[in-house]
Curated annotation (Swiss-Prot):
Domain S4 RNA-binding: start-end pairs: 38-110
Annotated protein name in UniProt: Small ribosomal subunit protein eS4
Gene3D superfamilies (alphabetical): 2.30.30.30, 2.40.50.740, RNA-binding S4 domain
BP-aspect Gene Ontology terms: translation
Keyword Zinc: no
Gene Ontology MF terms in the entry: rRNA binding; structural constituent of ribosome
UniProt cross-references to HAMAP family, sorted A to Z: Ribosomal_eS4
Length: 237
């Protein structure tokens, strides 16, 4: 389907539902699903407010003024999602897409020192030729590693990926005591210490608990991402 009715767009998209017609920009096929992404044009126009109209947003994007994860993107429908790094080339402003309790996903300004760093959650692993291990990440990225390195990284772990050097900078295993953020669902944006898990037959549906001070939130394993040990490894708020 080429078009998307505004009434069928994800509820958290910051678009005018009643003004400007019935159609919204539909994200193109890419690293994030429709449910958990924003088209680049919506980011430029409705989130960052660099444009007032879709036409203006398309012009800005077509000029190569927007980078996503260090790559110039000229497709105004390109899907922007969790932990993506968005750079406004003319101004040098850099943002990261992070979970937010109020907005679901929001773009937070980050320092230039973090522009090349992107947390990636491991969604699966595959054995490939030569005994090597291929990791599959939440943004559709894949990375092949030597057997000794690949075996140490498990599904649901997080790696901090260096976008410039295309290499893993830090490995954050999923284990009790780690700091995690809720990435989907009713508790989205909550950051706390991962202190409890109740395993179920379907591992992704296992119930986990995060604690921040006296506050405890519960969600499912599929909805959390490890982001550090005592503090987040990148800025998320």
């Amino acid at each position: 389907m080429v078009h998307l009715r505004k009434s069928l767009a994800p509820y958290w998209w910051p678009i005018p539902r009643k003004a400007g017609g019935v159609w919204a920009v539909r994200p193109s096929t890419g690293p994030h699903s429709l449910e958990y992404s924003l088209p680049l044009a919506v980011v430029v126009r409705d989130v960052l407010r660099y444009a007032k109209t879709l036409r203006e947003a398309r012009y800005i994007i077509s000029r190569g003024y927007i980078k996503v994860d260090g790559v110039v993107r000229k497709d105004y429908k390109f899907p922007i999602g969790l932990m993506d790094v968005v750079e406004i080339v003319p101004t040098g402003e850099i943002y990261r897409v992070v979970p937010d309790e109020a907005k679901y996903y929001d773009l937070k300004p980050i320092p230039s020192s973090e522009a090349a760093l992107k947390p990636l959650r491991v969604e699966g692993k595959t054995a490939v030729s030569g005994g090597r291990i291929q990791l599959h990440f939440h943004d559709g990225r894949n990375l092949i590693l030597p057997p000794d390195v690949g075996r140490q990284i498990k599904t649901f772990d997080t790696v901090v990926y260096d976008l410039e050097n295309k290499a893993i900078k830090t490995h954050l295993p999923l284990r009790l005591g780690q700091l995690a953020v809720v990435t989907h669902g009713g508790n989205i944006g909550f950051v706390g210490q991962f202190f409890e898990v109740v395993w179920t037959l379907k591992r992704r549906q296992s119930v986990v608990a995060l604690r921040k001070g006296e506050e405890v939130r519960r969600t499912i394993l599929d909805y959390i991402m490890v982001i550090g040990t005592e503090a987040p490894v990148v800025k998320i708020s």
